[in-house]
Amino acid sequence: MKEFWQTCVSRLEQELPPQQISAWIRPLVPLAYDEAQAVLRVAAPNRFKLDWVRKNFSHQIEALAAEWYQRPVQVTFELPGTSSAPRIPMAVPRPVAVSVPAVVAAVQQASEPAPPAPAPAPAAPAPAPASADAANIVYERSRLNTDLTFENFVTGKANQLARAAALQVAENPGTSYNPLFLYGGVGLGKTHLIHAIGNAMVAAGTGVRVRYVHADQYVSDVVKAYQRKAFDDFKRYYHSLDLLLIDDIQFFSGKNRTQEEFFYAFEAMVAQRKQIIITSDTYPKELSGIDSRLISRFDSGLTVAIEPPELEMRVAILLRKAESEGVPMPEEVAFFIAKHLRSNVRELEGALRKVLAYARFHGRDVLTVDVCKEALKDLLSVSNGQITVENIQKTVADFYKIKVADMYSKRRPANIALPRQVAMYLAKELTQKSLPEIGDLFGGRDHTTVLHAVRKISDARAKQAELNHTLHVLEQTLKG
């Protein structure tokens, strides 16, 4: 048993990053192996780690146990003290654990005014800490979603740089990438990544004070602090965090008092080498209604784009999601769905749920391409058409948050002229329409106007990285 567990840990070290080994595998303690029942019992230090290991690593441990014992083995996880069976000693070193009371105290201190220091008292034996309760307190205060981890984040060309940066931040918070600014369209995995960072840091067991907050909630916190005249408490809490995760910061637009308070929190945390991670739907300099001081601070760290997933990545996402649902999905079925639905991860997952529900309600035990065609016929009728100028106009208008009617109008403000020129450029690049035909579809404009727009955007694309990125995103959205 002892020899097996040492071999198991060694094998997992070859498959998993060091941080995961330290956070999840080394804290486990093998208790016993029941030869008759082929059951391996393993203890986890608290409920938080137990649930996580059972969900993310049990299949790997069971596979290694089956290989070692030459038979299928069931691995069960339990908390210390739930059984009288003796523990098996391990030669593998384990990290020093932070006491649960210290974690609880740190969390409480982060959210409440510090009470007066109590008078010294004689040392007394401490009661056994409620590990599961402490883990739950950390989780509830952090507002992290424990389902969003690095382990179940599908990586491809569209997000590999963002994932690499996120891993680096999780392992070395508050150093070179501070703040980390992730931007991209809806449903591309920004929220998943920042939760993964928070979960990894909490799991490392160092008692870090973490808070995930959507920008709207932060605004609400500021308003409540103002109404209750409790800004000192508000500042004490946010300034004391080790990791602050702000999602969709574009919602700070026009909220001057919120931006002012966030600026103070930002300055305080960075000065203490505490990590800040921000997501947005656009590049920092393209944020409207945001104080220039904040935009300057955002640019001082690392800014990484997450783009729409390419075909191979979309297939991998579908296969991973189907596996998590316990449903076998042939690769050709995943390929069919991925080929026709191209915009983002949420759309893919929604389509998969629709297919699974259709198959279940109609008694289809096996997923096939025909089942997908039936289940997704409404979605496919929209996505199957060729790229048209009308589709380009709508996609560009949605991206720049203007009306489609602005594409045909004679108005020329900058916030309309640029999107219109971008749409003309894409119409020339992605359709077979002639310049006069494109001009007609843009409110009867002359072909020389279209030619001017095409040349202007083409030249600017070669010189401006932000515009090139925008065009790349639009092209991939339109043609997959």
Curated annotation (Swiss-Prot):
Keywords: ATP-binding, Cytoplasm, DNA replication, DNA-binding, Lipid-binding, Nucleotide-binding. SMART domains: AAA (SM00382), Bac_DnaA_C (SM00760). GO terms for cellular component: cytoplasm; plasma membrane. Transmembrane segments: none annotated. Residues 360-480 are annotated as: Domain IV, binds dsDNA. InterPro entries: AAA+_ATPase, Chromosome_initiator_DnaA, Chromosome_initiator_DnaA-like, Chromosome_initiator_DnaA_CS, DnaA_C, DnaA_dom, DnaA_N_dom, DnaA_N_sf. Residues 143-359 are annotated as: Domain III, AAA+ region. Its main location: cytoplasm. It is found in: Cytoplasm. GO terms for molecular function: ATP binding; ATP hydrolysis activity; DNA replication origin binding; lipid binding. The keyword DNA-binding applies. Residues 1-71 are annotated as: Domain I, interacts with DnaA modulators. GO terms for biological process: DNA replication initiation; regulation of DNA replication. Residues 71-142 are annotated as: Domain II. ATP binds at G187, G189, K190, T191. Domain I is involved in oligomerization and binding regulators, domain II is flexibile and of varying length in different bacteria, domain III forms the AAA+ region, while domain IV binds dsDNA. PANTHER family: CHROMOSOMAL REPLICATION INITIATOR PROTEIN DNAA. Belongs to the DnaA family. NCBIfam families: DnaA (TIGR00362). Oligomerizes as a right-handed, spiral filament on DNA at oriC. Plays an essential role in the initiation and regulation of chromosomal replication. ATP-DnaA binds to the origin of replication (oriC) to initiate formation of the DNA replication initiation complex once per cell cycle. Binds the DnaA box (a 9 base pair repeat at the origin) and separates the double-stranded (ds)DNA. Forms a right-handed helical filament on oriC DNA; dsDNA binds to the exterior of the filament while single-stranded (ss)DNA is stabiized in the filament's interior. This is Chromosomal replication initiator protein DnaA. It comes from Bordetella bronchiseptica (strain ATCC BAA-588 / NCTC 13252 / RB50). The gene is dnaA.
